[in-house]
């Protein structure tokens, strides 16, 4: 009996040890278990975009005004860019050191369906470094950047999808590189990033793309694209490109 109990204890200990390592045998760092929610109150001053001339209007593209709020926060040491309840239309936004994005409940940051509102810059796409349209939310070289809240990043992809399928009907071999369209989130050379709680929907192209990022946490996100009435082409939920130490986790009881 003692031998049986001893064998059970050994097996239990072995199982516990197995749970503490990756499949390649390397130890799992404690970082993967420390999944605390973003505390926006600890991230500095809050800059609600509607306090700086941005209006709740889903028909007016307000890229310039929203970017000015981001730049103002960066110039003053950083802070949290707050998108309040409402729908705000924008092209590419570029976040700076010590700035963060917070989407309140029922807040929607919506991408323009006009590709001209997304500048062409050197970026990464399908394994290549090339000039391509930037995303709705962009971050490069940031340490500690966060996106949090209960709001939505809406890529507003319908017009882009229709254009893709029209081109594909004319040229069945049409590729993504021939029918260019923006992503929702693109981050490069960033570390200690956490994106949590938000909804990401209707991306024109890849929903999120991370290049050369490390210590990246994507927690309790809801990422969706439709299959009908117009199928959303190549709207991958998450694309990890030359990244390391990444955690994608959804709790057993998502919001919806």
Functional labels for PLM-detected ranges:
Residues 2-6, 16-82, 87-100, 104-189, ...:
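Extracellular "leader-to-stem" segments immediately downstream of a signal peptide or signal-anchor
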Residues 237-238:
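Core domains of intracellular innate-immunity/apoptotic signalosomes
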Residues 241:
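Glycine-rich phosphate/ribose-binding loops and adjacent secondary-structure elements
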Residues 249-256:
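Conserved small/polar residues in nucleotide/adenosyl-binding loops
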């Amino acid at each position: 009996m003692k031998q049986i109990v001893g064998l059970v204890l050994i097996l239990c200990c072995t199982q516990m040890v197995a749970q503490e390592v990756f499949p390649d045998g390397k130890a799992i760092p404690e970082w993967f278990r420390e999944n605390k929610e973003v505390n926006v109150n600890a991230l500095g001053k809050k800059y609600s975009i509607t306090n700086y001339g941005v209006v709740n209007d889903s028909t007016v593209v307000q890229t310039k005004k929203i970017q000015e709020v981001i730049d103002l926060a960066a110039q003053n040491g950083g802070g949290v860019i707050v998108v309040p309840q409402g729908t705000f239309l924008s092209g590419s936004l570029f976040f700076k050191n010590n700035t963060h994005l917070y989407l309140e409940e029922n807040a929607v940051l919506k991408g323009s369906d006009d590709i001209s509102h997304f500048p062409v810059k050197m970026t990464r796409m399908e394994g290549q470094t090339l000039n391509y349209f930037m995303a709705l939310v962009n971050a490069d070289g940031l340490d500690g950047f966060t996106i949090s809240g209960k709001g939505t990043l809406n890529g507003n992809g319908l017009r882009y999808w229709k254009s893709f399928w029209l081109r594909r009907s004319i040229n069945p071999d049409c590729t993504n590189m021939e029918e260019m369209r923006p992503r929702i989130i693109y981050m490069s050379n960033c570390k200690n990033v956490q994106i949590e709680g938000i909804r990401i929907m209707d991306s024109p192209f890849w929903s999120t793309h991370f290049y050369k990022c490390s210590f990246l946490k994507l927690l309790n996100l809801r990422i969706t694209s439709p299959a009908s009435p117009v199928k959303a082409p190549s709207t991958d939920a998450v694309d990890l490109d030359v990244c390391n130490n990444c955690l994608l986790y959804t709790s057993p009881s998502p919001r919806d």
